[in-house]
């Protein structure tokens, strides 16, 4: 089931879903990542969906609100690493690390949702999300705490929480439209 969900996301992002967005400020960035996340959430079952505001917060943190070199040149908003140098990528400066390069911005979001559903580092996240999907009681702090394996930064989950709080305070009109998508 997970493999078919991930295949659906990838197919939609690469072939049937040509939506792209432009941004020149935080509001447009937040709106674009939100729309991509909501789109993919509507084509997969609830237990595989990403929490919209967390998806946006992580994209904001990982890409400096879309201003990072990887975001600007490769539409990579989540710091997705590429291990095969024959695939499109951008090399990190002063490092051998390569980051994935996407044709469209929403492809990065689809890849992030796929990683949430397949990555071994997100096992705890999936348990928490699935429990909350069944009970239909979303606890953002609990979900965010389960993301502590995503980054080496020990303060990462606190940064996500602060960014989520900022997003909900500064852009309530955007997140009101996604209430049915678990914020």
What would you call each of these model-derived segments?
Residues 16-57, 61-183:
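Catalytic cores of secreted/periplasmic lytic hydrolases that degrade extracellular macromolecules
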Residues 4-13:
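Sec-dependent N-terminal signal peptides
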């Amino acid at each position: 089931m997970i493999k078919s969900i991930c295949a659906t996301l990838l197919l939609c992002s690469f072939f049937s879903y040509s939506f792209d967005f432009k941004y020149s400020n935080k509001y447009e960035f937040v709106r674009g990542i939100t729309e991509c996340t909501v789109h993919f959430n509507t084509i997969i079952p609830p237990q595989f969906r990403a929490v919209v505001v967390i998806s946006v917060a992580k994209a904001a943190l990982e890409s400096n609100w879309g201003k990072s070199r990887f975001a600007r040149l490769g539409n990579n908003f989540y710091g997705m690493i590429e291990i095969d140098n024959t695939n499109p990528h951008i090399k990190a400066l002063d490092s051998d690390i390569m980051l994935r390069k996407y044709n469209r911005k929403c492809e990065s979001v689809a890849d992030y949702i796929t990683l949430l559903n397949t990555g071994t580092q997100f096992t705890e996240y999936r348990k928490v999300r699935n429990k909350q999907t069944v009970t239909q009681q979303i606890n953002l702090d609990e979900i965010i705490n389960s993301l502590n394996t995503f980054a080496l930064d020990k303060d990462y989950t606190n940064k996500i929480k602060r960014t989520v709080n900022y997003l909900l305070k500064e852009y309530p009109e955007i997140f009101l439209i996604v209430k049915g998508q678990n914020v």
